[in-house]
Structure formats: C-alpha cells, structure tokens
Amino acid sequence: MTKGQLSDTDRIEVVKYRLEKAHRTYKEAVGSIENGYVETAVNRLYYAAYYAVSALLISYKYEASTHNGVIQMFGKAFLRNGVIDKEYGKTFNQLFSLRLTGDYEDRHILDMTTEVLPLVKPAKELIDTVSEMAKERIYLE
C-alpha cells in the first residue's frame, strides 16, 4: 500500500470511475441472482464492494496493488478506529471468502439461499456507505 502516487486530477477521475463501476457491478450481481448464477453473483457482489472500497481508499490517497492490500488498508484506515462500522469489514471479508470459494473450490457448491442472499443487503449498504464517503472526500478538496 502506498500513499499519494496519483495526481489529484487523476485520483478524482479514478475514484469516480471505480464508484460507477461498483454500482454497475452490483446491478450485474442482482441480475445474476435473478437468473440463478450463484458463482457469478458472489463474484459480482465481491467486486462491487471491492471497487467501492478501493475508491474510498484512493479518495484518501491510499493505493493498493492487491486484493489483500485493499482489505488490510480498509481495516487499518477505517474499521479499527471506528470511522466505519466493523460489520462492513465482516461483510467485505465474507464476500472475499465466498468469491474465492466460488471461483476456485471444486468441492464446495455455493448455496444461493444460505450463502449469497444473506449478503446482498449488507453488500449494498457497504457499497453505498463507502461510496458516499469517497464522494464527500473528493468534492471537499
């Protein structure tokens, strides 16, 4: 994780793009759920949250090159100090874990009802919360 590698103009553009991508990807997740595509739904839910969280980090001039870097910096910069409710961190970690399971585990079939659907609302709340924080941050500067 590094701090401040982007120019202010580039940072604002990247934040806007990632927030748009987060909301578009969330819609893809909902469509996948409606069509019964469990693994795709989990993948899209995770990536929607990932894009939103990474936008938040970038809005504060943090940049990560890995998924684990984003997860760790989110915890360090926003969860541990109570800026954001720790439940959002739990949601983000659950999404990451399920995404890995859906993408790479051959012996575990994800269940839409018990594993995916319970995360839809918390994922949306996470995305909306961090999106608003990122927007406020880039427009205040």
For every predicted segment, state its role:
Residues 1-141:
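Terminal alpha-helical segments
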